[in-house]
Amino acid sequence: NRRRRQRARASRERDFRKNKKGDLEALSFYGLERPAWRTDLETLYPQTKEILEQLGQEYKLGIIANQLPGLEQRLKDFGILDYFDAIFSSADLGLAKPDPAIFRLALQKTNCLPHQAIMIGDRLDNDIVPAKRIGMKTIWIKQGFGSLAQVKNLEERADWTVEKLTDVLPILLS
């Protein structure tokens, strides 16, 4: 009986490793429900406004995000909407990361070539890998979801890796 439970657990762990996103079918199979995302619990990383202020003096800033409807309002409520020149939200576009189409659309709409853009993200699978595939430079922030991931192959290796958002300033402003 103990051995059967161990095998079942190992099987579940293998399934979830293969299916990193924990899709609805897997959740249903195991009798689980996907928790609703709570936008009221969202917070900014420390010094976000100051960092955006500094970067905005040197760069055009944009967002490519898998977000629920209302992203612009949430950015406005945080007091950071005006720092961004372009916002590409999956809820508005019907495209989502890691689909390279959302990255290509953002580059096209901003008249930016891939080698001129830098993707800063906390997810290897949704941010770093697809941006690298289309030729963008990448910075992986090991903060938030990023703190849980580990680089497993060259495709997942960002051009720069930092521990927190403030660490991007020496890279981008030097």
Where are these regions (language model features)?
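N-terminal helical cap/lid subdomain that shapes the substrate entry/recognition surface
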Residues: 1-57, 68, 72-73, 160
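Asp-based, Mg2+/Mn2+-dependent phosphohydrolase catalytic module
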Residues: 27-32, 49-53, 59-174
